[in-house]
């Protein structure tokens, strides 16, 4: 489609479970993207994990053709985005390729914190935001209250927001009709030199690197030689096309369009996300502003159960980082677990998803250590260092100041659950910044240690508010705190992979809770297993996993007591010898025991 005025690039912003993937299905159905036989629920959530958990993890793109009431046919390039707080970087990448966004809000639940955060990102990037009320067929739908919330909380006019039900299909045609008139057409010169932004890329074993691009200017077709600006390498284009949502090859991609380019790039990092593509004949084309590199918030060690899998594990991580640019990793070795990688994630859900993807897609068996955040330490020498692994902490005597990361958490919660949420925030060492009453909801802002937020705060917030509270958070600053390193000893030996950094006030409680939890998780051996928690040289908690014991006296009927004593002494000596040479198998659950201390 050569006329730019008939192209619309948009994405959907919505909180988890507000129905954006279902709305996407309706769009595809109405525009004839798939036949009735090929249609299935949540067509765009193609990863097994996405279907099982009912969430969108990766951004997906679809090109549809919609015949509007004015008789014109519009090309809609639609990019589906995730709604979970851990995947906000996927959202910002999708928004960079669009001119507008649909803000989909559940007409029963109202505005949630994550939609607010993503909506502000869209407005900052200069996008036209169009509100849509979904789930209007539900008995608890209250459109007037929700319109009021959109205006009060986000600050955009929602008086004429389109009402629809993605599930039943009611009002979806009206959404499409409003969309082509509200969202502006892209700008760009088709005859100018090629300038395309890479929004996403993934590795295909047969095709090499497949890049999803938004063409800003010019055009690209099969047989062109393209130049990747950051690497300076030239590649020959094998094919270009769009997703309808099937892989559909086209003659070319022009300014304003979103589609894929395959150029037999075999090097995994040959076309990084956020890079600019141009033709090799016009290397002077300027680079487009990419995306801000996202910094991991949570670090954890990942180790293969069998050391033979180490090379496969490294290859799998390389392929995954291409598809998920926020994942960072570096080699690490542990006395207890051997060789593995220290990986940086955006949050706990991100960590779980990555581990599951590695285990499923690459057939690996992995052990994960307890997650940790980044701490800042000031040493007596005057230098400042950052530590993301508790086992790498320097000796306490050389540290003058220990600083932990503080996040600003914004929580939206109905008034009746406010008390429970405030209690939870105080328990997590939160300091209240402000509170605003917005209709039936309350917006509270807290400064909280990131360590407390990333571990289990999200789950506990949901359970304490019966699922109604929603959370968004961002890093604010480092702040001095009274922190200590909690070591775990098994039979007198420190296990580096189990070390934690905790607040001194909570250390004794955490130590006791952790040793008790470990006692439940470590299987009984033929000898006693002592589990201790220590700060420095001081043991603050201890439990013992009792030995399994064979009854050696079973064959003695009556007889002399010295005979029984002899058998017991012999058993005791054997156990003692076994304890010296025996090693304790620690299951995966024990490494993550820290996450389940409160449950």
Swiss-Prot record:
It comes from the Bacteria. It is found in: Cell inner membrane. GO terms for biological process: positive regulation of translation. One of its GO terms (cellular component) is plasma membrane. Residues 5-187 form the tr-type G domain. PANTHER family: TRANSLATION FACTOR GUF1 HOMOLOG, CHLOROPLASTIC, TRANSLATION FACTOR GUF1-RELATED. This is Elongation factor 4. It comes from Pseudomonas putida (strain W619). The gene is lepA.
